[in-house]
Amino acid sequence: MEIPKFLLIAIIVVGLSGSLTWAHSSAIANPEAIAEAIAEAFANAEAEAEPVAPIVAMAGLGLFAAAVAGLDWLSKKVG
């Protein structure tokens, strides 16, 4: 059985990245700073996502109205 080339490359890359992370002495130099950066990234993503929520809600309402109109048209056409 032959292993696909991309799978072999992926295994090598993952193995090397893991070994390099563990081998490097300052891989996790300051866990508090990393946790703070992750929390800040989530807060920024949430702040950017909020203005999109009303647009998504209106698009969903429009799709629902179109589906109802389509079903009404179909029921008149069939029945």
From Swiss-Prot:
GO terms for molecular function: toxin activity. It comes from the Eukaryota. Residues 24-51 form a propeptide. GO terms for cellular component: extracellular region. The modification Valine amide is found at residue 78. Its main location: secreted. Expressed by the venom gland. Keywords: Amidation, Secreted, Signal, Toxin. It is found in: Secreted. Residues 1-23 form the signal peptide. Toxin that paralyzes and kills insects. This is Ectatotoxin-Rm1a. It comes from Rhytidoponera metallica (Australian green-headed ant). The lineage of its organism: Eukaryota, Metazoa, Ecdysozoa, Arthropoda, Hexapoda.
